[in-house]
């Protein structure tokens, strides 16, 4: 009996083109900025300190979460 698992070729996952990924990331980041400013302002008002995540960090996080979802669909 032959061992059919010894010569298995691993198929590499399809990686999205870098330029296209960055275009989508930029669009999502810009779209998330206004909502991130509002969320940061409300968090600052409620908590009363500036230790909360800033608006740019919030928008960046959202873009990092959403953009790969688009390419994996």
From Swiss-Prot:
Q: Does the keyword Metal-binding apply?
A: no
**Quick check: keyword Nucleotide-binding in the entry?**
no
Q: Which UniProt keywords apply?
A: Bacteriochlorophyll biosynthesis, Chlorophyll biosynthesis, Photosynthesis
Which GO BP terms sit in this record? bacteriochlorophyll biosynthetic process; photosynthesis
Question: What is stated as this protein's family in its record?
Answer: Belongs to the PufQ family.
Q: What is the recorded function of this protein according to its Swiss-Prot or TrEMBL entry?
A: Required for bacteriochlorophyll biosynthesis. Directly involved in the assembly of both the B875 and B800-850 pigment-protein complexes.
Q: What is this protein called?
A: Protein PufQ
């Amino acid at each position: 009996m032959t061992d059919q698992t010894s010569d298995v070729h691993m198929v590499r996952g399809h990686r999205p083109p870098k330029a296209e990924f960055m275009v989508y990331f930029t669009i999502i980041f810009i779209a998330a900025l206004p909502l991130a400013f509002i969320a940061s302002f409300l968090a600052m008002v409620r908590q009363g300190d500036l230790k909360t995540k800033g608006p740019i960090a919030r928008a960046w996080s959202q873009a990092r979460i959403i953009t790969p979802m688009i390419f994996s669909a």
